[in-house]
Every structure is written in C-alpha cells, then in structure tokens.
C-alpha cells in the first residue's frame, strides 16, 4: 500500500501529542498489556508513522509482518498516535543517546519511539526479534521467518546500546554481490553506529591537504637520520601543531555533520629524532600531545566533537600524560609493542583516558584463511569474555575487523552483535546458541550442535582428515532427519563450507605440481560459492596468491580482471546431487582417529615420587615469541627463583620483555613478582621472589620480539603443550614427556618434522613436515616411563598422555592425579 504523502514534520499539534505520549511511556509504571496485531491472517492494526523519514522502515515492517502473518498491514501518517505507531519525538539526551528507543504495548496499540530515525529502525527490528524473526547470517537462506497468522505482542522495554559504535566489518571489502545483504544483516541485528568514530591513520592525509605548506616548512616533518622526511611529523614544532588544529577546524566547518576526525599517526616507524621531540617522550606521548592540542581547539569551536586515535604498534604503550576528555583512544588488540599483555594495555590507557574504544581483529584472512576455530570471531569463549570485559574497562566503541566468512565465524559474529548492544547477553550465550540451533536447524539441531562445537575456537580442532570426517558425518546425519527446505538450504551452505576446508587442507599439504593443481581446484570452487558468504572469496582471491609464491594465477585470472574473461570464474551453481556427493565422498575419504583424547587435571606436582631414571638433558628450542607460560614448583618458602633472560633476539624495537610470577595459592590470582628484560640481546639475571609454596606460573610476554629464558639444571620447569595451551616452540627442540601406566596409545597432533623416541632412546616414529595426527602404540612394559620428542620442529600437542614437557625427569611436573595413581602401582 502506498504511503500517505502528507508532510507532518511541521505539525505542532502532533509533536505535542507525541511528547505527551513519550512522557507517559517513560514515566508510567503501568504493566504492559497484550495487543493483537493480526488474527487468522487479517491485520487488526495499521502501521502509523509520525515522520516522513520513517517511510523506509515502515515499509520494511509491513513487508515482514505480511511474511509472518499473511496479512496486509496498511501504512498511514497521522497526528494522533494509534495502531503500530512509529515516532521520533524523544527527549534529547545528547550524542550518546541517538540510538535510544522505547517499545510499549497497551490500550490497543504498540508504540515504538526513538531518539532518531536510526533508533526507530532498531526498535522495529527489536520488535520483530521478539516476535521470532531472526537474521542469523546475511541473505535469505539464513533468515528465520515465523509463521503466525494470529499474532499477539506484550512488551515494555527501553533500550540503549552499551557500545555507542558497533562495527563488524570485512577487511579486503565485500564482493558487489554481498554488499547489500551484509548491510541488511547489520541493520537487522542493530550492528550499526549512533556515533561515527574515525580513528584510522591520518598523518598522510594532512600532508596531502597541505602539500604547499609542508614544502615551505620542511621543519614540520620528522627528522630521521639527519633528514626531514615523511611519514611522521615533528610534533615538538608548535607551528605544526597549530597547522593540524586548523586542519581539524576546517574539516568540521566543511562538514558540520561530522561526529569525529582521526588524528592517528601514519603506520610504521619514522618518528622524529630531534632533541625537542625526544624531550616530549615516547611515540605515544607525542601522538597524544598532538591529538590533545587538536581536541582543545575543536572543543572550543565545536563542543562535543571527538578526536579519534589508535593505541597501536609503536604508539600502543600507555602514555605518561592524560588524554583530553574528547580524545577517544581505540586500543588495538593486535600489533602491541612494549611487551604488554592486553590486560596491562587496557589498565594503562584506562588510567589516562576518559573513553576508550577497541580496535579488534575478529578475523583476518591472511591469518586464519576461513578455517574452523582459527579466528577470534569463531571463538565463543573469547567473545563472551572480552566484549563485557572491554566495556567494564571503559570501552564504548567497538570496531572489529572481520571477514565475510560466515561458515566458520557466523555464529560468533551474530552473538557479538547481541553482546555489543547489551553486554549482559554474555551471560546468555548458551541460550542464544540454543535459539540459533533450534530455529536454524529444527529437528537436525542435535548433530548441528556437535558440528558447531567443531567450529568453536574455544577448543580448536586441528585441521586434519579426522576433523573433516567428523564434519561430513554430522552433516549427513542432519540431512537424514527430515530437514525442511529452509533448513536443507542452510545445511547445503555448511556442506559447501566443509568442502572448502577439505580443498584448502589438500592445497596446504601439497607440494610442487600437485600444489598448483590443488590451488586451481580451490579457487575455481570458492568462486562458485561466493554468494553464500561461507568464505571470504574476495580476500582469498586478492591475498592468497600474493603470499604463496609456489602457485600462480593464470593470465586474466587476477581478481581485478573482468569476470567474463576470467578462466577460473564461472556462474554455475552446485546441484543438490553434487553437494550430496561431496558429503558421501568426504565420509569415505576422510578417516577418523583411532583414539579418544583424555582430559588431565591442571594442578601439577613434581614427578619425583615416580622415581624416573636420569636421561640426557634436552632443550626447549632457541627462543620464545609472544606469550609463554613456564610452570615451576617451590618446595619451601620464602624463595627466590633465579633465571636468565635475553630479549630482542629478532626485533629489538618492541620494548622490554615482561616476566611475571603467579603463585597458584595467591587468592586473587595476582602476580607477586615482576621483571623487565631490555631488548638488547644481552643476558640479564632475573630474580622473582615469592612467599608462597607449591605450583607457580611464570608468564613471559615479549610482543613477539624473540626472548630466551634459561634456568639452572634440575630446577622444576615444565611446559604445557596441548591444543588448548600450545607451547609455541621455535627452532629444533628435545623434550621429555611421561606415559602413564596402562596407556595403550600415544595420540596427538604434530605441526612439523622430528622424531619420537621410546624410553631407551630408540626412534619409533618419524614426523613429517605435513601437519597431522599421530597414533603410536605403546608396547607392553613401556608405559610408566619417559618418552621424548627429539630434533623436533613446530609444536606437538599431546592428547592421550599428560601434555607436560621438560628437559629431563628432575624438571618434570605432572598432573597430581597421575603422580598419585602411578606412585601407588
């Protein structure tokens, strides 16, 4: 039905009535009443809008209600609230309240009123969510539209988002075929922003806008090795700071609708080396000084406008100066310098800045290649923990770089939208996940719950034939449970995703001509499934060939080449029989493991009661990178743990490596000792004092610069190496592990070459460079002894024996229950 064209924006009588209605909605304590929207396929209420700007969302509401009930809902414009009423006359609560809305049913009407048209749009999709509509992933396949010819609603809510900006965006961008459905998914899940916070690298843009000024004033540029040059400023120069402040004022004058401007440094190094800049302090202090000056000038002329800046790379460490109240610092969860953990970084910035944002990395195709559980966006525990924690730490803006890969990460992205709006939803993850499984898969929810557990990065599964075999078998089981047409379409999408994982596994494991052939098969396949959004086709096509020089695209097959002439691009679609064949062949070709993983306790104790023999001492590799835990034991307290540390082995510019000591007996799980290792490639004595006995965790965090930790021979010192807690060993290493009595199979996963030695030092298995599971029988009488990995590269994840590695028996810690049980035998 066409909309009424009467213009209502200037009708003062209507505005007064709506304001009175809002007063009643926000102040009344009366209980909401049930309202009937439709009965037996007949609409009982019209949709009424108070503002012409609400026409698009009114049309969407009418369309969706028709799909749900079968009824045609008339759309009217009126000065008097009635029916399903949409209004924007909300009390003005400022920039932070642009998305606030209220929904209330009662007196035969349903009222949706918001601060802005944007807020009313949120209210409409919230109402539809409460009715049962879901848009789990982008596109019609992943819509869930309930069938309710008779529709009743009872609701009384006032909503405001916990994060003012909620962006889940795709690095590398979207295919044109995916842009509209992705935007639709964001809107339908309230994953849009009331405030636009700009925080990207900006120094280069300033230089471009004022090219003549910089040419006339080279002293505005950074002094590097005696030469004034881009891409950084000489921030100590007051004239430069005035220029940048004027630049900001000019931008706001040009576009008064701007909420913010970014003055984040250009990427990489090149910071000024002049004496005056050195006096200011760190790269962070310099960048923040400039942002503060800009904010001071902008606030005077344009109150309430924001200046955005990242805490990223060389300017990620916390500053020594406070941020201006209108400077919003978005802390990046990757590319952290200075050896800080994310927790330390947040605490440091929270102490200096009024408002924080988070620059997240839910999925970066270069890192995770759309594989199961490989990205943060597919790690439900990470999302459940971090989104409310960041908010508690002062974050009010969330920008999450992601990928258009709803195969591995779709459930995580969907749950993230719920938590970004309301962090309390983190407590409801299980019920939200069950809602997803019930509505998306119906009778097939049981096998699909198991399928999604394989995708969950909380307990990531190694990429292997076993994983593929289990995925295919669960899909086959789900398809056999009488799925309806809508559910079958979703299962088909996930079958195509599983086929992608299979093809990628074959490609990644191949060499020579076989690798090129597997690469071609992979790329031809991903183009055929591009509209499903299961994998990020644009990112793979643009990035993978540039990273892997052992393969090549043929002539005219680059991403930028026209689709019509690209020999690897086809518009064909897979048939139902072809998809069924993928599943059948996958079950046949991908064999399952012959062992069950065993869970061991986390309370470790010395293995001395087992009276294990002396063995040649091994080694733990050449260095560590990132964060690694060492486990040690204090027999008698107080004690001093003495180690030797060398940092900056690979990158000497990442700041000090940090060493923290955590006794497990400390009630609040706090560190009791801290040491920082300068990145000078020199040996430094580390002394960590503790007043606690028993098990201690030594955490070393070095920002991936490369750090070597050494300890005296015979000191209890063990590494845990499981899929949940990888040891992250570098170089060739030789470490021992214990095979408990009664063990029949040593099972696990290997990521590189090396040898497995039995208790007498005999090689019983040779590991290949290709990642994969291993299953080694334990001969009679060889259990209850030390085995070892020798000349090993990459990680070994132990799954049927305790995942505890040490240089010899004297340094080995084992799960308490294993020692107690085997010592009695």
Say what each PLM segment does.
Residues 15-23:
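Sec-dependent signal peptide recognition
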Residues 40-43, 52-60, 64, 68, ...:
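Feature activates predominantly on carbohydrate-active enzymes
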Residues 74-96:
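Short, well-ordered secondary-structure micro-motifs within conserved domains or adaptor modules
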Residues 232, 236-240, 337, 343-454:
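Structured mid-domain segments that build the active-site/substrate or prosthetic-cofactor binding neighborhood
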Residues 281-297, 325-342, 419-427:
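Acidic, His- and aromatic-enriched active-site or binding-groove loops in soluble protein domains
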Residues 292-317, 357-363, 398-400:
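Aromatic-lined carbohydrate-recognition surfaces of secreted/lumenal glycan-active proteins
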Residues 413, 420-651:
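Catalytic domains of carbohydrate-active enzymes that cleave complex glycans
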Residues 577-825:
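Acidic, Ser/Thr/Pro
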């Amino acid at each position: 039905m066409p909309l009424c064209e009467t213009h209502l924006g200037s009708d003062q009588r209507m505005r007064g009535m709506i304001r009175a209605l809002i007063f009643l909605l926000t102040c009344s304590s009366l209980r909401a009443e049930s309202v009937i929207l439709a009965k037996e396929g007949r609409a009982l209420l019209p949709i009424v809008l108070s503002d012409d700007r609400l026409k698009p969302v009114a049309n969407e509401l009418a369309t969706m209600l028709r799909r749900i009930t079968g009824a045609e809902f008339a759309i009217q414009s009126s000065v008097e609230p009635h029916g399903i009423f949409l209004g924007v006359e909300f009390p003005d609560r400022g920039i932070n309240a642009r998305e606030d809305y209220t929904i209330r049913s009662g007196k035969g009407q349903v009222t949706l009123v918001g601060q802005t048209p944007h807020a009313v749009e949120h209210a409409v999709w919230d109402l539809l969510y409460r009715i049962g509509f879901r848009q789990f992933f982008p596109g019609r396949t992943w819509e869930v539209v309930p069938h309710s010819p008779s529709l009743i609603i009872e609701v009384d809510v006032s909503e405001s988002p916990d994060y003012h900006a909620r962006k889940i965006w795709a690095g590398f961008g979207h295919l044109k075929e995916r842009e509209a459905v992705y935007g639709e998914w964001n809107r339908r899940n309230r994953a849009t922003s009331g405030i636009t916070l700009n925080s990207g690298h900006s120094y280069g843009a300033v230089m471009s806008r004022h090219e003549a000024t910089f040419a006339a004033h080279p002293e505005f540029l950074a002094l590097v090795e005696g030469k004034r040059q881009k891409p950084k400023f000489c921030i100590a120069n007051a004239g430069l700071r005035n220029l940048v402040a004027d630049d900001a004022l000019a931008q706001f004058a040009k576009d008064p609708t701007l909420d913010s401007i970014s003055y984040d440094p250009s990427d990489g190094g090149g910071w000024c080396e002049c004496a005056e800049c050195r006096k200011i302090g760190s790269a962070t202090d310099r960048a923040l000084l400039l942002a503060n000056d800009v904010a001071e000038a902008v606030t005077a002329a344009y109150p309430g406008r924001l200046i955005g800046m990242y805490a990223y790379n060389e300017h990620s460490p916390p500053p020594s100066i406070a941020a201006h109240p209108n400077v919003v610092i978005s802390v990046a969860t990757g590319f952290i310098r200075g050896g800080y953990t994310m927790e330390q970084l947040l605490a440091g910035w929270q102490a200096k800045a009024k408002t924080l944002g988070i620059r997240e990395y839910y999925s970066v195709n270069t890192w995770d290649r759309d594989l199961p559980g490989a990205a943060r966006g597919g790690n439900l525990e990470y999302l459940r923990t971090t989104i409310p924690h960041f908010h508690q730490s002062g974050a009010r803006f969330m920008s999450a770089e992601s990928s258009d890969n709803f195969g591995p990460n779709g459930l995580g992205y969907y749950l993230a939208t719920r938590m970004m709006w309301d962090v309390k939803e983190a407590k409801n993850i299980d019920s939200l996940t069950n809602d997803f499984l019930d509505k998306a898969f119906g009778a097939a929810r049981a096998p699909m719950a198991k399928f999604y557990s394989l995708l969950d990065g909380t307990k990531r599964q190694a990429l292997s034939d076993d994983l593929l075999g289990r995925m295919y078998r669960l899909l086959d089981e789900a398809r056999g449970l009488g799925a309806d047409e809508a559910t079958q379409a979703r299962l088909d999408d996930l079958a195509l995703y599983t086929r992608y994982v299979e093809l990628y596994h074959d490609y990644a494991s191949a060499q020579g001509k076989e690798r090129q052939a597997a690469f071609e098969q992979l790329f031809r396949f991903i183009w055929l499934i591009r509209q499903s959004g299961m994998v990020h086709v644009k990112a793979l096509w643009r990035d993978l060939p540039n990273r892997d020089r052992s393969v090549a695209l043929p002539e005219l097959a680059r991403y930028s080449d026209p689709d019509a002439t690209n020999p690897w691009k086809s518009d064909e679609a897979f048939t139902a029989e072809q998809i069924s064949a993928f599943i059948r062949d996958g079950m046949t070709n991908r064999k399952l493991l012959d062992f069950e993983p065993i869970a061991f306790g986390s309370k470790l104790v010395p293995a001395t009661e087992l009276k294990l023999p002396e063995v040649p001492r091994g080694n733990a590799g050449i260095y560590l990178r990132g964060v690694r835990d060492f486990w040690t034991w204090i027999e008698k307290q107080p004690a001093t743990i003495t180690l030797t540390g060398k940092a900056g082995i690979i990158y000497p510019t990442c700041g000090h490596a940090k060493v923290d000591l955590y006794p497990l007996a400390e009630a609040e799980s706090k560190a009791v000792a801290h040491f920082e290792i300068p990145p000078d490639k020199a040996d430094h004595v580390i002394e960590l004092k503790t007043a606690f006995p028993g098990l201690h965790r030594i955490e070393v965090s070095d920002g991936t610069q490369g750090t070597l930790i050494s300890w005296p021979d015979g000191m209890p010192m063990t590494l845990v190496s499981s899929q949940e807690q990888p040891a992250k060993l570098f170089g060739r290493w030789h470490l021992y592990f214990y095979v408990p009595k009664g063990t029949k199979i040593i099972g696990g996963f290997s990521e590189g070459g090396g040898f497995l030695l039995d208790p007498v030092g005999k090689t019983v298995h040779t590991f290949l460079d290709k990642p994969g599971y291993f299953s080694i029988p334990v001969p009679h009488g060889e259990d209850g002894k030390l085995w070892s990995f020798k000349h090993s590269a990459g990680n070994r994840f132990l799954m049927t024996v305790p995942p505890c590695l040490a240089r010899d028996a004297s340094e080995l810690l084992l799960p308490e229950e294993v020692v107690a049980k085997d010592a009695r035998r």
